[in-house]
Amino acid sequence: MNEIEKRVLSTKWFYHFKLPSGAVTEVYIPEEIAGIHSTREQMMGNVLDPLFGGRWSETTAVDLACHEGYFSIALAQRGCKRVLGIDAREEHIRDAELIRSAYGLPNLEFRTGDVTKFDPAEVGQFDIVLMFGLIYHLENPIAALRVAHALTRRVCLIETQIAPNLDATVEWGSQHFVKPTVGVFAVVDEWEDLHGAPKQAGLADIALVPSLEAVLWIMKRAGFTRVEVVPPPPDSYEQLARGQRVIVAGYID
């Protein structure tokens, strides 16, 4: 075990990282919640491995809201030509850089950036776009989904908590004119999460949590040619198994 791994193992993390020596990091979240990450990774692989297996060395990926870089590392270890992880919090990027050093992955880089203010032209397009655990923390999740689409060359995976849907109509200027709702956003107060420690919420204290119908409709309207809900595997993390969280794949065909 080298000095970098010793530094990594001296603290607790959001993820269980299995380091090159075989040592595994401790987590500061409850173990029953930490299981979400292995389910996410398995669902990610179930979509991406059939598409890019055998061609990873020609494939590029960006991980938006990468946190400590868990999924960025999973893609870099598959042999991606280039993986870029972006997160708004500098402390997350510092942690991700330390983890990257422990793995020694030259095809992986991290940078600080706010997805809600991001100009896709700055980095170009990627074969794979990940956006896990982000949009339900945002004031403007639609803008984030548009950014994700602009960055996507082949496939984008969105993972999110979802709100209940409402099948209804809205009066539109007169009682004689109505429009059907195509999806719902629930308003959530994240003030305590934002001002607590460790910070896992978004950068604002108001969050809009979408219904599944909203995610599917907006991704199609944003320009994805095909949008599919990724089925959870057996023994999934309970929220994904119950459909309270989902991974949605958006394709550019």
Regions found by a protein language model. Give the residues of each.
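A structural helix-start
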Residues: 90, 138-139
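S-adenosyl-L-methionine-dependent methyltransferase catalytic module, highlighting the catalytic core
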Residues: 130-131, 139-252
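Conserved SAM-binding site of S-adenosyl-L-methionine-dependent methyltransferases, i.e.
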Residues: 135
